[in-house]
Amino acid sequence: MGALVLTGCSERQEASTTLPTTEAAPTTEALPTLGPADFPVPEEAREQTPEGAVEFVRYYVALTKHLAVNSRDPEPLLQLSQDCRTCNQIAQALTADLAASYSYREYAYEFDEYGPALVDGETAEVGFAYVQGPITAVDQAGQIVPDRSAATPEELQSGASLLWNEDLQSWVITGLTVG
């Protein structure tokens, strides 16, 4: 009986003409686009990490400029926030600018994070310095609108509270303090 088993294993076998594939099935799907089509939320800002939280706030600040300079509907600011009073005020100001046909000749700012975000599960806190200005808003006649402009740069100690939104696979801002 033992001889049969050994003999069967020692017989010559033809090699397979096909090799197993080494391609792995994709483990993650691409994230759906979030934000305006011409200024989407970058992938690194959609990571549930301290770095991702900082990049999300950096993006949100840049989005505000993008919408203002391009005279665009501020709806993306609202879509990327949740119960954020300051976010709502910014969106209302941009809506008022659109209604008044204001445009921006100049819109400079700097965003400097204080370090990594503090992440605790589904929430994060990001501290940053926001240097605003110069910003020059003009009316239809090209006249400067003083209450929508800032002639000299001003550093404002700022911060943001974030919540991870599983449906969006992104952070959303729940609180924003500028200054």
Regions picked out by a protein language model, each given a short descriptive name:
Residues E110-V119, L162:
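Short amphipathic beta-strand and strand-loop transition segments with alternating hydrophobic
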